[in-house]
From Swiss-Prot:
Name of the protein in its database record: [2-(trimethylamino)ethyl]phosphonate dioxygenase
GO molecular function terms attached to this record: gamma-butyrobetaine dioxygenase activity; iron ion binding
Source organism superkingdom: Bacteria
Organism: Leisingera caerulea
Region entry Disordered, spans: 95-119
Keyword Iron carried by entry: yes
Lineage, broadest ranks: Bacteria, Pseudomonadati, Pseudomonadota, Alphaproteobacteria, Rhodobacterales
Positions of [2-(trimethylamino)ethyl]phosphonate binding: 187, 200-201, 203, 286, 288
Positions of 2-oxoglutarate binding: 198, 341, 343, 352
Summary of the function given for this chain in its UniProt record: Involved in the degradation of the naturally occurring organophosphonate 2-(trimethylammonio)ethylphosphonate (TMAEP). Catalyzes the hydroxylation of TMAEP to (R)-1-hydroxy-2-(trimethylammonio)ethylphosphonate (OH-TMAEP). Is highly specific for its N-trimethylated substrate. Cannot use gamma-butyrobetaine as substrate.
Reactions that this protein is recorded to catalyse: [2-(trimethylamino)ethyl]phosphonate + 2-oxoglutarate + O2 = [(1R)-1-hydroxy-2-(trimethylamino)ethyl]phosphonate + succinate + CO2
Reported cofactor(s): Fe(2+); L-ascorbate
The keyword Oxidoreductase is annotated on this UniProt entry: yes
Length: 377
């Protein structure tokens, strides 16, 4: 909670001192823009009701006081008085050290290697218990993957899985697709060959940010699923070869898919994507779908390929992958912007039948946020 406040003589900002002794400065224009009163924000949905042009350019702090854990500010020249909860100000403080490491991950993310057990949650518990659902979604948000076990063994059950948190993203493959051996397949995923760890559909813009794979049959020998944390692989490259990391993050790769029925998809994005302030936000890695790299300067191409090769070596490192075999009624979700998935080759004896679909993280995060608010998380 705030303990005291001091407004600068210019009125352009104030300094808030909290009970723990920490201090944060807030600008007048920022406070006015983020006012929580019903004339500025809709009480129903929190959406802003004013534009930046509605706020006077010379907005300044006329008075500021702390009382009962809240900050009350009067703005000139409007003469408008607004109260801000101290907890809200603490959680939204921006007067912090912004000089963070390039290539860092979000504090909400936990990177991992082969020592990470595959988190597993029960289908019925997730459907019936909000806390179990919250824990399931939280694992996907933190780790980038999780299993769901004891589900129904029926076609299309993965659609029910997606509806627990969001919506299926339909593509040219349909609402969902089959993953099993085919004669003359249009995609290598439909063969019995092993697949290198990869992210799906890098040739789409934007890529589907979640993938669900649901097992209906799995009596074939082999065919274990493997997941690899792309963020951890990129961290290893960054620590070993910062210049190589910068090349993969600072130059776009190209990805392409030509399928049947007139489908031709292209995208131009970096293999390692950073936010403007340097946070790692996405990995795209799919050797099968890589198009010729034509956006890297001639003098950097060999170094780019060396970094690409090294990233692939980290991804293929057995110490990086978590493996498991899905049983009928089991499924797993991966964050397709972070976690790569692979498959060991399987024999022609027995049968292996999975169904897959795509979804997006906005629905997952929305459901998780609502559950956290309800459960006090």
């Amino acid at each position: 909670m705030p303990r005291s406040v001091t407004a600068d003589a210019s009125g352009s900002f104030l300094t808030l001192t909290f009970e723990d002794g920490s201090e944060s400065r807030f600008h007048a224009i920022w406070l006015r823009d983020n006012a929580l009163d019903p004339e500025t924000r809709s009480p129903g949905n929190g959406q802003r009701l004013i534009t930046i042009g509605d706020i006077p350019a010379d907005t300044r702090i006329s008075t500021a006081l702390v009382d009962d854990g809240a900050l009350t500010v009067t703005f000139a020249p409007e003469g408008k008085t607004v109260t801000f909860p101290g907890k809200w100000l603490k959680s939204n403080a921006y007067d912090t050290d912004q000089s963070s490491e390039v290539g860092r991950t979000s504090p909400d993310v936990e990177t991992w290697d082969s020592s990470q057990p595959a988190p597993a949650f029960d289908w019925n518990e997730v459907q019936s218990d909000p806390k179990a659902k919250r824990d399931w979604l939280d694992a996907i948000a933190r780790l980038g993957f999780a299993k769901l076990v004891n589900g129904p063994v029926r076609e299309g059950a993965l659609i029910e899985c997606a509806s627990m948190f969001g919506f299926v993203r339909e593509t040219n493959y349909g609402k969902y697709f089959e993953v099993r051996t085919e004669v003359n397949p249009t995609n290598l995923a439909y063969t019995g060959l092993g697949l290198q760890a990869h992210t799906d559909n890098p040739y789409r813009d934007p890529v589907p940010s979640l993938q669900i794979l649901y097992c209906l049959e799995n009596s074939a020998e082999g065919g274990d699923s493997i997941v690899v944390d792309g963020f951890r692989a990129a961290e290893r490259l960054r620590d070993e070869d910062p210049e190589g990391f910068a090349l993969l993050a600072g130059n776009p790769a190209r990805f392409e898919y030509k399928g049947s029925d007139g489908v031709h998809l292209r995208a131009r994005r970096p293999m390692i994507e950073l936010s403007p302030d340097g946070e790692m936000i996405a990995i795209r890695f799919n050797n099968r779908s890589s198009a010729p790299f034509v956006d890297i300067p001639f003098e950097k191409m060999e170094a780019y390929y060396a970094a690409y090769r090294r990233l692939g070596e980290f991804i293929d490192d057995p110490e990086m992958g978590v493996s498991f075999k899905l049983e009928p009624g089991e499924s797993f979700i991966v964050d397709n912007t972070r976690v790569l998935h692979a498959r060991l080759g399987y024999s022609g004896s027995g049968s292996r039948w999975l169904q897959g679909c795509y979804a997006d993280k906005d629905g997952l995060f929305s459901t998780l946020n609502v559950l956290n608010a309800q459960l006090g998380g």
